[in-house]
């Protein structure tokens, strides 16, 4: 199996970059201690006092907003962030977690990191996903990867993890999607899976066909009144036959995937869909990845929301569809199977679906096919993110 061959042409460095105060986790080199990060966090905790980290953050955001070489979207987002930071400093108040957000966020995507946090030699922070994308883009362009903030060189040997920031981020509060209460980010997953009284659960009689889904605190009442335990054997056999058919389809899918994994030519890569707008009078949102190389060919992925309907914002049901485009020339038809799965740093739920297409110079793009997201809630999670990070698998079928 070939290794991950990642996208070129812009990379995360081209996305909006917010400045992060260099006092947080700054070290003289990869081996530097993370003590300054803890000191900055302690200073930021002072109630009602505009700390140096917040002031420095506001100044650097203003500089990023005024940078004439920065992309327009980056300048706009940096200007908005600078206004918010300046307002927080002027007020000298606000919740600690809100003030720390701009200090601890990734300098590339401006989101709080979900996993590992890396820092350049000047202390600018990058989440694991953006860090990997910067390195991959530079490799494909045959350039030295640089920090999007200070332009110092970055690599796996020059950058180090910042454990102080990782631990600080894990303690910041985050809202439960079911009960809307706040918990430390490190405890939120366990709460949502095991403890939340409003989490969605299933009836214990689902094995004999009960379709009920509901909040956990209603489970006992439902199970006491559930009609499925009293059904006759003939009624249950009909339900079990339907469940067996569904199980057979699922097994057929996984057997097909295992068969594809035995192919000689297999490629995979992490892809990053970025949002764009059409030039129409009423603009429409669409997504596109930078060019990337897999199986020695150049490709691009595009995606659209609700099949580009006129007003997807008025629909309660949200879907994404995508197409794969071959950008390089081929001397013979290229028959491939492909599928998209969630990326290594995201938690979106996607059901694997295998698609098949024969690429030629005349027919070099697939039709739009559904991105098999579990439901509209998962789709909204993707749409709410600044970028959509997925993993593409390509299997070349040889005659």
UniProtKB/Swiss-Prot annotation:
Pfam families: Sina_RING
Keyword Cytoplasm appears in the UniProt entry: yes
Example of a GO MF term: zinc ion binding
Major location (coarse): cytoplasm
Subcellular location: Cytoplasm; Cytoplasm, Perinuclear region
Subunit architecture: Interacts with LGALS3.
Protein name from the UniProt record: Zinc finger TRAF-type-containing protein 1
Species, as recorded: Mus musculus
Gene: Zftraf1
